[in-house]
């Protein structure tokens, strides 16, 4: 019973702390969000269908409240645990209780607990067992008496204290540990190091860095307070690979002098020098290394959090790229000797045909001669309108080949380069084997390349998000944290768009709010066994899809051309009565959803009356109206599509000052990589993204953006292109 009370108290205190911390939200919003989450509602459901209650908070804001509450509840529980552990030792005082109450970080809590923690056997504990604690206390009194004479009284052969020196050394160990355990000294020295410390790196084994990736860190330093996150991760990686040694250096003369002044009451005492030595020893062996570890951990955690956030933002923009609807697409997985694999998909993603051609060096002359004709025949046979070329090995040679062939086709067929990051991971996965059991791995890749252009979201959810190529130092961040963030991003993106329940794969459905891997598979099995769903109510018959899961999921599951037109919208069934009443009031029951006539009919409605009649807020009313007026809405259609090309651009043709259009492929701390149609993506450094100060590249560009760039530097030998998004006319203005 006691445990339950404690848990409730910790939860309640954590809620109060969230309100005090996250002042950008009203207390009522925080209570509402946490209440809805406790009732088993999902983040996407709350964000879309409970806007009236939350004040239109989005998924990111809801998750921020959820995560902060969870962290603070664990923090409060740790506080209670420390209080209990100290109390069990009979050492809990009002001062300690007050200090615990004031603590706002885990570091502060652990500093308070440190003196009471069960220690492993140290030199200080051995010295205490040898009876030297009274001697240590005497030394701290800094009397005028002789240290040697006092030390002699503690010689004890049985306890291995054989000399005066042994006694003094033992007492120094005890004093050093006491000082190390003082929370206030650790706090002072930690803050001093954070403010004045310098992160330094020196080369350790240069031969391990063959490509000179870490050359700038061979002799490098940067203040702790201003070091940027991506350099922290680069240093960590260089250190992990044994290329450099990293330390934090700081001159602690001033703070140690203050400790000395506080501890040494009588500087002329014979014991003063010994106490001073103990203070230095305490810092050198205990406090200093611990603070260095803590600060490096803090810097790493901060850098990892940012790297995860950037990865999440890049992934979101990648998933929400515009789909290429209504196109017959030929996917081409490039290769030299083994041939380019081709796969054609129709407007729905169904595979129409596949083939292999050998247009490149490595294949026989005869095969190369046949490749062009084979390619053109396939394009004509299936009515291909768009070619998707993977950006891997032989990509640019394949682009040249495709451009040459398309010039010989009388009608307009265009191509684009598609990132094939993760295509090989997908091709060898269980999902791919289930979809295409009789295909070779490379043939599956060609299908994936075509489909990820046609519907990026539906295809990319089949791949581990870590494999899609938009991360930064993703192997240097905690996997659990990264997975949680990426799962959240995928879930948010899928629910933002919604899915057609009659065509969606289980891999896509499992990200719908309220569904799991099992229930998603059950939806597909039910569909296969019983035919297409004709209304949303049928979803209730799916095994293991209970009332709560149905409530959470149904609004995100669309049934196109079903028996109820509302089922093709994102209006939730709980609001169908509102939708029917709106149409009745406007005498528009027979008008098609999304039609100009319906839009006209709804213009004159008194929305205030509707809200009062149904007891709903403005947000729910707007959601219903949007569903009636834009039934097939897809937020991705507002995003610019990929750059479609009909001719190739060679690296050699680039010139400094040349203006180009490109696609942002990756955003990192120091800039953005842009595909301009040559072999290597060009880098737009953060300083070249726009005029003026840029806090982070993601404030200016996002993955998938189409941008205008100018070539600022070329290195054909290294295949490097530097770009700028600041036009020549704005350079000096």
Residue ranges and their predicted role:
Residues 1-31, 38:
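Generic start-of-chain signal for non-secretory N-termini
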Residues 294-312, 467-498, 611-656:
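Long, charged amphipathic helices and adjacent flexible linkers at domain junctions
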Residues 42, 54, 58-158, 496-638, ...:
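Accessory alpha-helical DNA-binding modules that contact the DNA backbone or grooves
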Residues 2, 58-64, 71-331, 335-439, ...:
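Duplex nucleic acid-engaging cores and interfaces of nucleic-acid transaction enzymes
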């Amino acid at each position: 019973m006691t445990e339950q009370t404690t848990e409730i108290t910790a939860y309640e205190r954590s809620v109060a702390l969230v309100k005090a911390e996250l002042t950008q939200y009203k207390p009522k919003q925080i209570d509402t969000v946490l209440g809805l989450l406790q009732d088993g509602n999902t983040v996407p459901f709350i964000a879309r269908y409970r806007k009236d209650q939350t004040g239109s908070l989005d998924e990111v804001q809801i998750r921020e409240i959820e995560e902060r509450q969870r962290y603070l509840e664990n923090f409060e529980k740790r506080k209670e645990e420390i209080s209990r552990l100290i109390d069990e030792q009979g050492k809990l005082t009002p001062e300690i209780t007050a200090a615990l109450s004031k603590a706002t970080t885990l570091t502060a809590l652990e500093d308070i607990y440190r003196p009471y923690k069960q220690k492993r056997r140290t030199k200080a504990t051995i010295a205490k067992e040898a009876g030297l604690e009274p001697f240590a206390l005497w030394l701290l009194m800094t009397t005028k008496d002789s240290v040697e004479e006092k030390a002699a009284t503690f010689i004890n052969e049985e306890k291995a204290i054989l000399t005066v020196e042994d006694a003094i050394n033992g007492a120094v160990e005890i004093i050093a540990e006491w000082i190390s355990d003082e929370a206030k000294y650790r706090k002072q020295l930690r803050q001093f190091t954070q403010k004045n410390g310098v992160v330094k790196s020196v080369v350790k084994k240069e031969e391990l860095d063959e490509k000179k990736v870490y050359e700038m860190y061979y002799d490098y330093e940067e203040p702790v307070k201003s070091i940027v996150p991506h350099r922290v991760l680069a240093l960590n990686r260089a250190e992990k690979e044994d290329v450099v040694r990293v330390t934090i250096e700081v001159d602690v003369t001033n703070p140690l002098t203050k400790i000395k002044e506080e501890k040494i009451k009588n500087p002329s005492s014979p014991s003063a020098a010994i106490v001073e030595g103990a203070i230095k020893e305490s810092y050198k062996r205990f406090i200093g290394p611990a603070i260095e570890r803590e600060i490096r951990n803090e810097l790493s955690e901060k850098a990892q959090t940012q790297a995860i956030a950037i990865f999440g933002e890049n992934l979101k923009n990648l998933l929400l790229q515009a789909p290429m609807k209504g196109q017959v697409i030929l996917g081409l997985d490039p290769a030299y000797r083994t041939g380019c694999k081709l796969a054609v998909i129709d407007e729905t993603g169904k595979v129409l045909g596949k083939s292999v051609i050998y247009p490149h060096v490595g294949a026989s002359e005869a095969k190369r001669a046949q490749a062009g004709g084979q390619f053109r025949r396939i394009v004509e046979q299936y009515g291909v309108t768009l070619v998707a070329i993977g950006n891997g090995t032989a990509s640019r040679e394949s682009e040249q080949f495709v451009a040459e062939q398309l010039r010989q086709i009388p009608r307009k067929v265009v191509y684009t380069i598609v990132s094939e990051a993760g295509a090989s991971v997908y091709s060898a996965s269980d999902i791919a084997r289930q979809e295409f059991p009789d295909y070779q791995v490379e043939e599956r890749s060609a299908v994936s390349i075509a489909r990820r252009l046609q519907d990026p979201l539906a295809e990319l959810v089949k791949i581990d998000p870590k494999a899609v190529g938009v991360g930064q130092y993703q192997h240097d961040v905690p996997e659990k944290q990264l997975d949680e963030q990426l799962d959240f991003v995928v879930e948010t993106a899928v629910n933002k768009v919604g899915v057609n329940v009659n065509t969606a794969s289980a891999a896509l459905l499992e990200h719908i709010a309220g569904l799991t891997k099992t229930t998603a598979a059950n939806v597909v099995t039910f569909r296969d066994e019983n035919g297409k769903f004709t209304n949303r109510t049928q979803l209730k018959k799916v095994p293991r899809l209970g009332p709560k899961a149905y409530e959470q999921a149904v609004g995100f599951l669309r049934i196109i051309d079903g028996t109820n037109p509302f089922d093709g919208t994102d209006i939730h069934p709980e609001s169908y009565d509102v939708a029917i009443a709106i149409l009745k009031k406007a005498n528009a029951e027979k008008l098609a959803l999304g039609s100009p006539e319906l839009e006209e009919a709804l213009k004159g409605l008194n929305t205030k009356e509707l809200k009062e009649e149904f007891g709903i807020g403005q947000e729910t009313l707007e959601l219903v109206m949007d569903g009636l007026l834009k039934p097939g809405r897809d937020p991705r259609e507002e995003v610019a599509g990929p750059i479609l090309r009909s001719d190739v651009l060679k690296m050699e043709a680039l010139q400094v000052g040349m203006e180009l259009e490109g696609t942002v492929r990756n955003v990192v701390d120091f800039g953005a990589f842009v595909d301009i149609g040559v072999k290597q993506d060009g880098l737009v450094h953060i300083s070249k993204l726009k005029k003026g100060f840029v806090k982070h590249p993601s404030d200016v560009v996002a993955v998938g953006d189409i941008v205008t760039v100018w070539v600022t530097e070329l290195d054909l030998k290294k295949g490097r292109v530097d770009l700028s998004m600041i036009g020549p006319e704005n350079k000096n203005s």
